[in-house]
């Protein structure tokens, strides 16, 4: 505690010092700089480039918003060949990410803002019970679908709870992907293509994209974007079972032998993304704007993208890009969004209606052999079946109908306001069917007296089906009093009611009386109000001090845990529901710009109550979520960017985060300790640093040559908050820090661009999470000679070339 208190005092002092130095430096630059700004960039009267956002529902200069917000331009994403959320957020202050493979895309969020995370880093194979701590919007549709980053205007990253700005609340922050709108002015388009090769891959990666803007009249236009991206894979599956036509492992010396037949599969984690988006924009009158859009994406993945760090059953270590699982783990996902946005300008305010419907569904095959082999299931329940291949066939679905109305006043009055109403009906579905293929046939041969019994038994080991429905109704708003030309106070409130229901059907066990299905249904409503307060002071025309106190909220839910019968848990009633978790975010900061310098410095402290944790029940390991006590996250965020002379640009982002439990974590209904107070929250590095430096040269013929280097560093992270080992699955681990370096060199003419790029220049094997060998590794004693231990790693070095042609 002494250390934490010392940090807060020292951090605050340092932050104020940095802010004052930045402000003074910016003032000096404004007086001495004579560099010419590009003519196509909007500037204020004193030469400051304007970056506009719509975070508050109106178009405004990001420097005039009294909150902590970062903007990533779509052009920068294109120029640096960034197409994934993970790569983008590595360069955003306050954010940390887990390097989930493509199988987890759309199933679990990989982003944490300001340290608010207790979900184990390795989660990602199954739809979690809890919702993410960071809300995600595609334009004005709240959804987490992890779309590819193509044809994007900008990304707005807001830190801290945002429930009084948007209908969908959040705990840690909000990420908004703002797509490019159709343009009335002219017909134009572009085509992009890239080819690259990743270390340890036997093939090449490639992508092709096209964008068309088609104006039909001065107030009607259409925009189409489409493309595909193929990654050839780089993880080799070293010892996959050879299967017969029924999916049963082949026994080369007869069904009763302990021998197995395996093969290797190189570059098994290939992936393919196909996407398209169509939007139509109309302005029937000067006051009315309508935009209808449809977006879809399809993902297919050959297998998992994480290697095994450890040994096989013969004691031989796996290579750095080898996985020891006995079964391939393919997956697929389809996602769709249909949205209608309408804006009407009344003069004094703009009324916006955002109606949307999204749907996504996915499937995957998972290998559970390591889990069964290391937790006694094969010995106790399956007579040590010699070719263990427990396979999980999983599905997930998420669909919602959302309507949001927002009335936003024009700025410049004594009082400014944002008023909103929000409705969402969300349906979630998940299933898990586990098979041990070949077990009943082997058991019938091993125990001939019971052959009829085993032949009738089949190979299905476990069935789990879950249907959830969630209703969210909210009224929200902000009121700003501009009591001085340079000072203002804002207050906000979000009042809401949630209704949540969960129906689950489970049929565990191969053998009677354990294979009797039992349904469970639990409902849970909640209603409350959240508040926000903000003060901001314009220290100079382009410099602002701000401080905010805001409350965040994440809905609770219910667990399907049997209360009675063979599979009842001890203290099962304590597992039936988990409460909402809430937080109080306090921050102060200074942001501004002068000439070519931009800066944003902030310190924050977050008190997190009733923290939610995805876990398993202690006896039978049912999927569940639980509440803990309290946690605290505090830290410092720093962003600097600008130009040095006419040709150099730079950016520097730094985050310090100290996120820990402030109360011990116990198993619900018991006094079993899972984590002591003071435990570091998982996937949250203390230090995050990123930066970039670029140089532009202009040739006599007008061509531009741009060279850029970017780097990121994160310090060590923990794998799970459960460090004591009372959990069914022990995954406690700590992973060292690592650095990533990227290079690019581009030559561009009037309507074309060619880029040579290198990602992960030093081929750093950075690990951000794992399924540990202690729980998933090899176990020759039960004839499991592979390993399901896996590490979530950064993508190996990738070298490629991309081209773009505009027409």
Protein language model regions, located:
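Acidic, small-polar-rich N-terminal luminal/periplasmic segments of exported/outer-membrane proteins
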Residues: 46-184, 588
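Membrane-embedded beta-barrel scaffold of Gram-negative outer-membrane proteins
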Residues: 339-368, 538, 544-550, 577-636, ...
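C-terminal beta-signal and adjacent terminal beta-strands/loops
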Residues: 712-722, 746-807
């Amino acid at each position: 505690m002494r250390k934490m208190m010392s940090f807060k005092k020292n951090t605050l002092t340092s932050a104020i010092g940095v802010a004052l130095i930045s402000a003074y430096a910016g003032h000096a630059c404004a007086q001495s700089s004579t560099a010419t700004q590009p003519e196509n960039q909007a500037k204020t009267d004193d030469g400051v480039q304007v970056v506009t956002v719509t975070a508050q529902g109106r178009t405004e200069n990001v420097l005039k918003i009294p909150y902590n917000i970062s903007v990533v331009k779509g052009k920068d994403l294109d120029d640096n060949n960034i197409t994934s959320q993970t790569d983008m957020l590595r360069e955003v202050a306050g954010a940390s990410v887990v390097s989930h493979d493509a199988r987890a895309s759309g199933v679990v969020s990989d982003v944490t803002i300001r340290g608010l995370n207790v979900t184990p880093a390795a989660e990602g194979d199954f739809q979690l019970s809890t919702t993410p701590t960071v809300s995600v919007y595609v334009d004005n549709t709240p959804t987490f679908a992890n779309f590819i980053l193509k044809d994007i205007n900008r990304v707005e990253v807001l830190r801290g709870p945002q429930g009084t700005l948007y209908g969908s609340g959040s705990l840690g922050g909000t990420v908004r992907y703002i797509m490019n709108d159709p343009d009335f002015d002219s017909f134009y388009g572009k085509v992009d293509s890239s080819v690259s090769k990743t270390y340890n891959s036997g093939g090449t990666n490639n992508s092709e994209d096209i964008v068309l803007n088609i104006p039909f009249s001065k107030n009607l236009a259409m925009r189409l974007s489409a493309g595909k991206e193929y990654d050839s894979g780089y993880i080799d599956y070293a010892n996959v079972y050879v299967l017969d036509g029924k999916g049963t492992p082949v026994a080369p010396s007869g069904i009763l032998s302990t021998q197995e037949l395996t093969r290797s599969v190189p570059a098994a984690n290939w992936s393919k993304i196909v996407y398209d988006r169509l939007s139509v924009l109309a302005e029937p009158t000067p006051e009315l704007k309508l935009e209808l859009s449809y977006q879809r994406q399809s993902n297919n993945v050959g297998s998992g993208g994480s290697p095994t760090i450890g040994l096989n059953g013969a004691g031989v270590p796996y290579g750095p890009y080898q996985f020891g699982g006995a079964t391939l783990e393919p997956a697929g996902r389809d996602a769709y969004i249909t949205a209608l946005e309408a804006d009407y300008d009344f003069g004094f305010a703009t009324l916006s209606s955002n109606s949307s419907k999204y749907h996504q569904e996915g499937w995957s095959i998972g290998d559970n052999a390591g889990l069964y082999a290391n937790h006694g299931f094969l010995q106790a329940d399956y007579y040590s079946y010699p070719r263990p291949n427990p396979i999980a066939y999983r599905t997930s679905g998420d669909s919602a109908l959302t309507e949001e109305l927002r009335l936003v006043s024009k700025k410049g009055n004594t009082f400014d306001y944002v008023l909103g109403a929000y409705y969402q009906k969300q349906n979630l579905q998940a299933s898990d069917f586990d098979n041990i293929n070949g077990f009943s046939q082997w058991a019938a041969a091993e125990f001939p007296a019971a052959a009829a019994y085993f032949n009738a038994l089949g190979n299905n080991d476990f069935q789990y089906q879950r249907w959830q429905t969630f209703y969210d109704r909210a009224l929200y708003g902000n009121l700003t009093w501009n009591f001085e030309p340079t000072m203002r106070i804002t207050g906000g409130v979000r009042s809401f009611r949630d209704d949540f229901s969960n129906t689950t059907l489970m049929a565990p066990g191969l053998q009677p009386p354990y294979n009797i299905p039992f349904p469970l249904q639990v409902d849970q409503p909640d209603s409350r109000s959240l508040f926000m307060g903000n003060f901001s002071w314009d220290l100079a025309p382009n410099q602002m001090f701000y401080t905010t106190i805001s409350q965040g909220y994440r809905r609770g839910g219910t667990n399907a845990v049997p209360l009675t019968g063979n599979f009842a848990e001890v203290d099962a009633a304590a597992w039936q529901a988990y409460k909402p978790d809430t937080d109080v975010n306090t921050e102060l900061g200074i942001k501004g710009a002068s000439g070519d310098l931009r800066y944003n410095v902030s310190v924050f402290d977050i008190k997190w109550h009733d923290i939610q944790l995805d876990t398993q029940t202690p006896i039978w390991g049912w999927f569940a979520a639980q509440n803990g006590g309290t946690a605290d996250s505090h830290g410092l965020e720093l962003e600097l960017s600008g130009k040095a002379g006419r040709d150099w640009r730079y950016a520097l982002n730094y985050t310090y985060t100290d996120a820990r439990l402030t109360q011990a974590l116990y198993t619900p209904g018991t006094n079993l300790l899972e984590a002591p107070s003071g435990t570091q929250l998982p996937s949250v590095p203390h230090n995050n640093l990123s930066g970039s430096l670029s140089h532009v040269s202009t040739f006599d013929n007008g061509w531009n040559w741009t060279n850029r280097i970017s780097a990121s560093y994160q310090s060590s992270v923990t794998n799970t908050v459960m460090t004591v080992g009372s959990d069914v699955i022990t995954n406690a681990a700590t992973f060292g820090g690592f650095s990533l370096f990227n290079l690019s060199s581009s030559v561009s003419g009037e309507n074309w661009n060619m880029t040579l790029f290198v990602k992960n220049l030093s081929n750093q094997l950075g690990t951000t999470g794992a399924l540990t060998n202690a729980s998933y590794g090899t176990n020759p004693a039960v004839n499991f000679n592979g390993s399901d231990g896996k590490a979530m790693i950064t993508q190996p070095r990738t070298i490629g070339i991309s081209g773009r042609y505009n027409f």
